[in-house]
């Protein structure tokens, strides 16, 4: 089967969050038995050099704000084909210092137009699988009746809150037919279109990244036209839980850890916890923290409204009042949040047990997974979440809000702790206190939580199997 995966992130080359990891993991898993090609836009200022073998190069035209020119380079990469598309005559659109900017609907619609033209040049494609609103124009362009090839189209919603509202005139610049364009337009204001809305109507099948989040989407009434769209397509909509790549997230081989360990040490828990303690000591030394504070609770997250920044601050207060260690590693994405957390960071510089690092540093994050006893994910909503899966793999017990994919993967008393209420801190503090008390006074129970998490399947092969079931059902 020839499968195209189209996205604007792909780890490790271009990544801002879990999207890049998810696209890589799925593509890698599918490539074990199928012909998988990943399409990415070229970001001149931030795309790293690809050292893999070049297997093909193309030059082609596409339509977006007139006739444009693009080129592609295809690399052989880990059993897949990685194709990077450069918008040669609109290169300025992607000449930015970050993946996401203020004109993303323009940039990514141009990429979708180029990707559609590229796909039409291929001899045969069975499936085109598109990820998130950024590629929302692509299913509409591939469904055009005048297209020579008509591959089956799968669309995955990674975050329903981001939809790609834009002007209808902008999408019309791609040459899409009036009928195709109507799938994107809002009835209440035809001058406004939504990339995600059109993708829902123009795809053969729609998925999201966990079963519970699929139900959350079906009950989302924030925009009644988006609700109508997903309800109209609910018969071809399901949630498939994301997985992680065990080869990438593996405490046995992770070079960022001072002491490696793995599931093989579950028969010798004292050795396992000694290894984690060695990582903790190294981390404390690195950050200038006092070693006597335990347990260690960490948060590794983007600091945005979705992720519950008010709960992050509350966790700091709880740690200071209860004498355990807390480390936050995360990046702010707006000036106001940056200002607030920078002030908090400065005020805690001399704290013996709390540290805030306002940047995402992967080696540090990996060491934190290996050192921490607990990982907190206090999200208001979470489509799937990968940090809790990584944490469990590293023997770090997740403390999470029971929402979306977190509710599907973290079970209280089995592999972690949860809280439900997002409108007050009482339930959150109850969860934190229960976790700290269990760690300090019930070591056998704590080990069972660690063991259950480390033995949990990564879910990657199951995820790939479910997607293959969908692909095959459409062919």
UniProtKB/Swiss-Prot annotation:
Biological process terms in GO annotation: glycogen biosynthetic process
Statement: the UniProt record of this protein carries the keyword Transferase: yes
Alphabetical list of SUPFAM superfamilies matching this protein: UDP-Glycosyltransferase/glycogen phosphorylase (SSF53756)
Binding site for ADP-alpha-D-glucose: 15
InterPro entries: Glyco_trans_1, GS/SS, Starch_synth_cat_dom
E.C. number: 2.4.1.21
Catalytic reactions of this protein: [(1->4)-alpha-D-glucosyl](n) + ADP-alpha-D-glucose = [(1->4)-alpha-D-glucosyl](n+1) + ADP + H(+)
Keyword Lipoprotein: no
Keyword line: Glycogen biosynthesis, Glycosyltransferase, Transferase
Molecular function via GO: alpha-1,4-glucan glucosyltransferase (ADP-glucose donor) activity; alpha-1,4-glucan glucosyltransferase (UDP-glucose donor) activity
Pathway connected to this protein: Glycan biosynthesis; glycogen biosynthesis
Role description: Synthesizes alpha-1,4-glucan chains using ADP-glucose.
Entry similarity comment: Belongs to the glycosyltransferase 1 family. Bacterial/plant glycogen synthase subfamily.
Protein name per UniProt: Glycogen synthase
Organism field: Chlamydia felis (strain Fe/C-56) (Chlamydophila felis)
